[in-house]
């Protein structure tokens, strides 16, 4: 196997793909800053149409719907990943669904001038559909075009795109920029620009060579793309691995979502995938950002929004740190470190929140705990769940697995957003004890059940899971080895 290099075509393709990740992050964070302004828009529009003052309950319900409908769209979109990637390919799927981003951006951008609450809500739903699809497309594409030795580092770029998107949304949402009564439609409609940029650039990116060889049987084209992307002529071993997987796929029946749970050789990796996604959303990261503005204010920070943006900067910096660590320390190790550090910080936040009224210096302890909590999140639970799912499955079950994992992430995100305000109201600072318990459970699960995938090919990882499956239950028989016994590929050394 030739030594793969970081080439310009590879960096270009991954950068263009992560525009989809940026879109997800941007549209997640963009709705928060102009909350009061959008509520005024809802109030004025409803009053004009009904000729009467809308109730506070109706306004709150419409605002909540505007926020939550994004996650509903994400759930539907993420579950539809397989419908696109198997038919159109990875690259073409990313290209096609930008129509949703442009449509959603137009609906939101023109809702004010049209005096239409319905356009705002529909736009959020459509952009949610788009982002849900992107959470499947982007990690899958990056994982399939990256050399084995760099797959984790490049996979982390998906999360980097997300956190940069959130940070840009926070900055653009400032009153000095687009967070004003006049310009907030531009803030929401900005999502059109990255969509158009990605549409213009994607035709210059290659299709996934794994898709071309395994799904389309285009071996020569796949070989040519691999050589160009990896900067080496010696890709014979990688091509052979894909051909072996293609033969393996031909011997198995088509993998559906139900088959992932029924087939013994898929059951363990899909459970791991779901648990890793839950470890991200149930870690308490959204709760920390929910509390952060108030905590910064209590600590005497004059403009808490800038401190929250500072937390977003920490978010971004430690995602970059994770990028350099993931191929050295490994996925499993970083995930364990992240979960353990977050559990400690969560406990520290509970104590400091309970004592800050009696001891003002405790507010600064809490701020420190928040920033370190965010740092630990981006070392492990932030980036790793997104790309490790693509590593745990072969070409056949991968689209269905990405759909299930993505849907579980979006669903848990939706439920946390729905239930957290009530939990915070009744439990106060003790709400972080709940997240601490979740973090401990996920740490134990990761320690005992999650394998290390660093430096291993897709074929090696897939084979390793079959060791626990009785021979008669496997979809296909063949040589099997323990996950712990697989040596990393030479590229990874």
UniProtKB/Swiss-Prot annotation:
Residues in compartment: Cytoplasmic: 1-10, 86-90, 143-153, 205-269, 326-331, 390-399, 451-493
Pfam families noted in UniProt: Sugar_tr
Parts of the chain that traverse the membrane: 11-32, 65-85, 91-111, 119-142, 154-174, 184-204, 270-290, 305-325, 332-352, 364-389, 400-420, 430-450
Location(s) in or outside the cell: Cell membrane; Perikaryon; Cell projection
Chemical reaction(s) catalysed: D-glucose(out) = D-glucose(in); D-galactose(in) = D-galactose(out)
Membrane topology category: Multi-pass membrane protein
Annotated GO MF terms: D-glucose binding; D-glucose transmembrane transporter activity; galactose transmembrane transporter activity
Extracellular topological segments: 33-64, 112-118, 175-183, 291-304, 353-363, 421-429
Region (Important for selectivity against fructose): 277-279
Stated regulation of activity: Deoxyglucose transport is inhibited by D-glucose, D-galactose and maltose. Galactose transport is inhibited by D-glucose and maltose.
Annotated GO biological process: D-glucose import; D-glucose transmembrane transport; dehydroascorbic acid transport; galactose transmembrane transport
Phosphoserine modified-residue sites: 485
Cross-referenced InterPro entries: Glc_transpt_3, GLUT, MFS_dom, MFS_sugar_transport-like, MFS_trans_sf, Sugar/inositol_transpt, Sugar_transporter_CS
Keywords of the record: Cell membrane, Cell projection, Glycoprotein, Membrane, Phosphoprotein, Sugar transport, Transmembrane, Transmembrane helix, Transport
Binding-site residues, D-glucose: 159, 280-281, 286, 315, 378, 386
Function: Facilitative glucose transporter. Can also mediate the uptake of various other monosaccharides across the cell membrane. Mediates the uptake of glucose, 2-deoxyglucose, galactose, mannose, xylose and fucose, and probably also dehydroascorbate. Does not mediate fructose transport. Required for mesendoderm differentiation.
Similarity annotation: Belongs to the major facilitator superfamily. Sugar transporter (TC 2.A.1.1) family. Glucose transporter subfamily.
Name of the protein: Solute carrier family 2, facilitated glucose transporter member 3
Organism of origin: Sus scrofa (Pig)
